[in-house]
């Protein structure tokens, strides 16, 4: 299945149903009073995180989602039926952004997590809501409010403990094949990896971690060169980054300058990502003499001003790979997992449209008190029906 990590969708919640103007009329009850019911609320739209999904390709073809409208109120104080909600399933790790405001609506980081992205309209009130001691035959009603409309951008971010970055042909795919059961394509030309891939590294029966491999970066990636930096977002949730450096580039370029390119592109993309724990890993030591490998490694360390520990491995021959993985496992065990973004729990307040309806009711009562007179005739059918619109 094709990997798609971005999709734009339109969500339109259902409108609220209108209130009803009706009067009870039965045999021997010619003037039964108002019995118009309220409308139904409009349907809401939710996102649901599903661990069985791993791509957003479905939403490249179906881009619009509209919830059902609430039914109008009916006579005999019958309330209209509520509109049906819509639930949209997305992969775990999906970030939801509002394209209109640019705000992050939510992060779907847990299986079964549910997020409301569009609220349905509130129901209109029937004329039975407006009856009072001075207005016993009201012809007022309110209309249902419109449902919320939003244009959303869905971004899928891989959930991994360890992320790898480096130039094309640095050996990232070879490394992930060596330490996990993942089988990304490996070849001797740049950009063999076109989409991110995940692998599970099992150290023993109880300990394991997830590693992510993304397409390689080149100089100018932040300006759109190569595959650009669109895949760097998949490293945002990683707890540690492995910066792989090829000690024996096939184009005979300077490994120190190559390493510097990656650091610069990382800083241009995001300061937060550049500040994540990053380990320096020198790969392909099997292609050159040990002394030459050590010499090149020290030159890179000096160029970058690197003060931490560095590793020298051969992913193809699996030299020193197991020791690196155990060090990564120990580091992850010593670092607490990043707290998942807390779901915002709204304060318990009255619904936003309650104030609107309360104002309409108060307005009608005030008008009725001003216009009240003793000559009011209940059988007068010449009254005017009044509809309040928001």
From Swiss-Prot:
Keywords: Cytoplasm, GTP-binding, Hydrolase, Magnesium, Metal-binding, Nucleotide-binding. It is found in: Cytoplasm. One of its GO terms (molecular function) is GTP binding. GTP binds at residues 166-173, 191-195, 213-216, 283-286, 314-316. The keyword Nucleotide-binding applies. Residues 364-390 are annotated as: Disordered. Its EC number is 3.6.5.-. InterPro entries: G_OBG, GTP-bd, GTP-bd_Obg/CgtA, GTP1-OBG_CS, GTP1_OBG_dom, GTP1_OBG_dom_sf, OBG_GTPase, P-loop_NTPase. Residues 364-384 have a biased composition (Acidic residues). GO terms for biological process: ribosome biogenesis. GO terms for cellular component: cytoplasm. It holds the Pfam family GTP1_OBG. Mg(2+) binds at residues 173, 193. Its main location: cytoplasm. It is an enzyme of class 3 (hydrolase). Residues 1-159 form the Obg domain. Its cofactor is Mg(2+). Belongs to the TRAFAC class OBG-HflX-like GTPase superfamily. OBG GTPase family. Monomer. An essential GTPase which binds GTP, GDP and possibly (p)ppGpp with moderate affinity, with high nucleotide exchange rates and a fairly low GTP hydrolysis rate. Plays a role in control of the cell cycle, stress response, ribosome biogenesis and in those bacteria that undergo differentiation, in morphogenesis control. This is GTPase Obg. The gene is obg.
């Amino acid at each position: 299945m094709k990997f798609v990590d971005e999709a734009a969708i339109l969500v339109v919640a259902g409108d609220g149903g209108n209130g009803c103007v009706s009067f009870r009329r039965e045999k021997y009850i010619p003037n039964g009073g108002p019995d118009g019911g309220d409308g139904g609320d409009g349907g809401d739209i939710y996102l649901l995180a599903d661990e069985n999904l791993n791509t957003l390709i479905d939403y490249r073809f179906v881009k619009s989602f509209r919830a059902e409208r609430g039914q109008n109120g009916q006579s005999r104080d019958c309330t209209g039926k509520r509109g049906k909600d819509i639930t949209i399933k997305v992969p775990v790790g999906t970030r939801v952004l509002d394209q209109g405001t640019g705000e992050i609506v939510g992060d779907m980081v847990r299986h079964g997590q549910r997020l409301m992205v569009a609220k349905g309209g509130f129901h209109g009130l029937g004329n039975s809501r407006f009856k009072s001691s001075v207005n016993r035959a009201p012809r007022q009603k309110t209309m249902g409010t419109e449902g919320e409309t939003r244009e959303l951008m869905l971004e899928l971010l891989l959930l991994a403990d360890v992320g790898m970055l480096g130039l094309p042909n640095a050996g990232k795919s070879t490394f992930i094949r060596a330490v996990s059961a993942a089988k990304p394509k490996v070849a001797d030309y740049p950009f063999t990896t076109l989409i991110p891939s995940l692998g599970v590294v099992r150290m023993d029966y109880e300990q394991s971690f997830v590693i992510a491999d993304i397409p390689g970066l080149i100089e100018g990636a932040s300006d759109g060169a190569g595959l650009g930096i669109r895949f760097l977002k998949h490293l945002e949730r990683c707890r540690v980054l492995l910066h792989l450096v090829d000690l024996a580039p096939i184009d005979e370029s300077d490994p120190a300058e190559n390493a510097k390119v990656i650091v610069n592109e990382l800083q241009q993309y995001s300061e937060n990502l550049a500040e994540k724990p990053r380990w320096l890993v020198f790969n392909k030591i099997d292609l050159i003499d040990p002394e030459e490998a050590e010499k090149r490694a020290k030159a890179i360390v000096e160029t970058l001003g690197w003060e931490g520990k560095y590793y020298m491995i051969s992913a193809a021959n699996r030299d020193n790979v197991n020791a690196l993985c155990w060090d990564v496992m120990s580091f992850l065990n010593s670092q607490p997992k990043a707290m998942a973004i807390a779901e915002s729990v709204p304060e318990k307040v009255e619904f936003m449209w309650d104030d609107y309806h309360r104002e309409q009711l108060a307005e009608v009562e005030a008008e009725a008190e001003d216009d009240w007179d003793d000559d009011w005739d209940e059988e007068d059918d010449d009254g005017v029906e009044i509809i309040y619109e928001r």
